[in-house]
UniProtKB/Swiss-Prot annotation:
Catalysed reactions, as listed in the record: O-phospho-L-serine + 2-oxoglutarate = 3-phosphooxypyruvate + L-glutamate; 4-(phosphooxy)-L-threonine + 2-oxoglutarate = (R)-3-hydroxy-2-oxo-4-phosphooxybutanoate + L-glutamate
Descriptive protein name: Phosphoserine aminotransferase
Native source species: Enterobacter sp. (strain 638)
Pathway(s) served: Amino-acid biosynthesis; L-serine biosynthesis; L-serine from 3-phospho-D-glycerate: step 2/3; Cofactor biosynthesis; pyridoxine 5'-phosphate biosynthesis; pyridoxine 5'-phosphate from D-erythrose 4-phosphate: step 3/5
GO CC terms in record: cytoplasm
Enzyme Commission number(s): 2.6.1.52
Signal peptide annotation: none
Gene field: serC
Record's subcellular location: Cytoplasm
Length: 362
């Protein structure tokens, strides 16, 4: 079978070693004669899977002991509701930074529960899309929390600063597309959430990291399945969790630890992004319209100078084993998502193809 590199934005490529282990264990896990998908989530065998996954996740991110880790349903969109329902308390407003599509989606959901103070951080610098630095964000005086999305997968825009607003500001962040891809100081945040389907594992699982002093504040109308306190008190098993996704994510955590952890991922991700952006910037045939300071390392959108060639590019790249390069319908063009599981070899293969395609069609 020919090598295929999957550049999908999510569900995304998983480490080949993890897939092979899951394949090997699929029908007979731990000698039980059954699949891990079939065993009880309350049995001692799966409890061990769950505990090891949380421990490895904590180790990878050096999560402080005063933070709880929840394994949840609902994805990022579920947390768009979960954040206000758990954190508003007796306040009626919260600060929301809008830097792109997913941040705006969080704002839309927040309007159901509060009056969001929307901080429009989108700017244009020398004709390129960019984001205002955090020092220019105008926070309100009585906000229950601040919400932002550091990496916009559709727009290819990233906020590389980590928040430093002081202890009075409860910072919440959607890290679905960047978690485990580089250094992260968890102590700067009140709540971090991430859908698993990009850098953690398969779709269906969402991880929430919540500072323990923020528990116990959920609105009385908050569904129990979104209530952080209920989930924490029940060890993320208030109802049957997505056990197979939890198991696979645990395998990914072990793969990460075996391969140098977050520090090594950070190094490789930087190499991949630099290679791809340098190929785009060194050509008049391809272009990226994001300012260099705000370019995403995970999601690289680019356009061809002649959009009439888009269909040909996608057909030829797919035939070459380079899959899922079509850009999101909102922005068009192409997009290469290069999360942790994408090896440097995959980006090398893509850039070689891009150079050759330009030679033949430019």
């Amino acid at each position: 079978m020919a090598q295929v590199f999957n550049f999908s934005s999510g569900p995304a490529m998983l480490p080949v070693d993890v897939l092979k282990q899951a394949q090997q264990e699929l029908c007979d896990w731990q000698g039980l004669g059954t699949s891990v998908m079939e065993i009880s989530h309350r049995g001692k065998e799966f409890i061990q899977v769950a505990e090891e996954a949380e421990k490895d996740f904590r180790d990878l991110l050096n999560i402080p002991s005063n933070y709880k880790v929840l394994f949840c349903h609902g994805g990022g969109r579920g947390q768009f509701a979960g954040i206000p329902l758990n954190l508003l308390g007796d306040k009626t407003g919260a600060d929301y930074v809008d830097a792109g599509y997913w941040a705006a989606s969080a704002v839309k959901e927040a309007h159901k529960y509060c009056t969001p103070n929307v901080i429009d951080a989108k700017v244009t610098v020398d004709g390129l899309r960019a984001v205002k630095p955090m020092s220019e964000w105008q926070l309100s005086d009585n906000a229950a929390y601040l919400h932002y999305c550091p990496n916009e997968t559709i727009d290819g825009i990233a906020i590389h600063e980590e928040p430093n607003f002081g202890n009075d500001v409860v910072v919440t962040a959607d890290l679905s597309s960047t978690i485990l891809s580089g250094p992260l100081d968890v102590s700067r945040y009140g709540v971090i959430y991430a859908g698993a389907q990009k850098n953690i594992g398969p779709a269906g699982l969402t991880l929430v990291i919540v500072r323990e002093d923020l528990l116990g504040k959920a609105h009385k109308a908050c569904p129990s399945i979104l209530d952080y306190t209920v989930l924490n008190d029940n060890d993320s098993m208030f109802n049957t969790p997505p056990t197979f996704a939890w198991y696979l994510s645990g395998l990914v955590f072990k793969w990460l630890k075996k391969n140098g952890g977050v520090a090594q991922m950070d190094k490789i991700n930087q190499q991949k992004a630099e290679l791809l952006y340098s190929t785009i910037d060194g050509s008049d045939f391809y272009r990226n319209d994001v300012a260099k300071a705000n370019r995403s390392r995970m999601n690289v959108p680019f356009q061809l100078a002649d959009s009439n060639l888009d269909k040909v590019f996608l057909e030829e790249s797919f035939a070459a084993g380079l899959h899922a390069l079509k850009g999101h319908r909102v922005v068009g063009g192409m997009r290469a998502s290069i999360y942790n599981a994408m090896p440097l070899e995959g980006v090398n293969t893509l850039t070689d193809f891009m150079v050759d395609f330009e030679r033949r069609h430019g």
